[in-house]
Amino acid sequence: SVLSAMEANILSGQPLQAAYAAMDDANFYNVTLKNFAAPWTNREQSVFVPLNDYIATVVGMIRDDVPFNTLFSHNLLYVGPGTLPPYSNFNNDHYAQLEAQSIDMMTGLQQTTQSAMTGLPQNAVAGVWTTRAAAEAFFVAGTNRAQFRFTMLNHLCNDMEQVHDVKLVPDRIRQDVSRSPGGDSRLFLNNCVGCHNGMDPLAGAFAYYNFNEETGTIEYTEGVVQDKYYNNDTNFEPGFRTADDSWMNYWREGQNQFLGWAQGGPGSTGSGFGAASMGDELANSDAFASCQVKKVFKAVCLREPENAADRAQADLMVSSFKAGYRMKQTFAEAAVYCMGQ
């Protein structure tokens, strides 16, 4: 049994192996990991949501040690067994049934690709961003800034206030942002500009995406910017008019260098086209790695890292995580550290 395997590991001085044995269990996947990922998939950040393709894909990635820094770029999707209603672009029935039938995700999830299952062209696929659940929550209506803001919140552990920097160039702020809200330009110069100057050039990567509420499906219009990018374009006509899905990371300058952008390898370009390359930029930052560790620490230890010892442990876990981006290992390391607490 799992318990006897854990006991043997602990008695032989191998607590990390004991933690891995504990994860070799349906509850780790169906309960712990489902609840871990669920809040990232909706605007309310609620854990009380049905299983969906975003959650299942996170669970599968962790199970299979898929490097987690590909979270926003990998052409990947996890589905349940063939006995379920087939995966649909138009509803969540496949995953609702997977959950209703209590199928063990440790053995029942199968890896496939989004392009094969959804018909999205391969260059449109951007990891969990292009799952149906993420599109329904964050590409619906609006201006597609939500997908970016909730990624910052859920995966870089920073909301827009924390990355506010009024000193950056404002040349890619869209036309819908009034330069004198309520007739007062000081409000823009001291407040609005500090988020939009960094967010708008990055969120340009999402220019071809929309979630169609009538059909219940994600849309990708290659080469054609979604109309939502021109909402309220008369607010400030000299503002930036989105022409394609190019993006630029202005946060590589100024105070937001502290997010620790990659200087070489994946995610080090600083600019590009499309969501997947922008996803690599975010997921290879120090902020992404430390955020995953912080979330795992809290999920396992039931508290944030709070004292010097906790913070030192978190730093060790970040270094270990960046060596292979294996989330399961991060869970195991947190479990060993908080064992008996």
Predicted regions and their residues:
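Active-site-surrounding "flap" and adjacent substrate/cofactor-binding loops of secreted or lumenal enzymes
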Residues: 2-22
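Extended surface/linker regions that mediate inter-domain or inter-protein docking
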Residues: 17-202, 283, 287, 297-300, ...
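Electron-transfer interface patches adjacent to heme c in soluble/periplasmic c-type cytochromes
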Residues: 20-21, 134-144, 178-179, 185-187, ...
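Alpha-helix boundary/interfacial micro-motifs
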Residues: 171, 213-215, 341
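Short cysteine/histidine-rich zinc-coordinating motifs and their immediately flanking basic loops
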Residues: 204-209
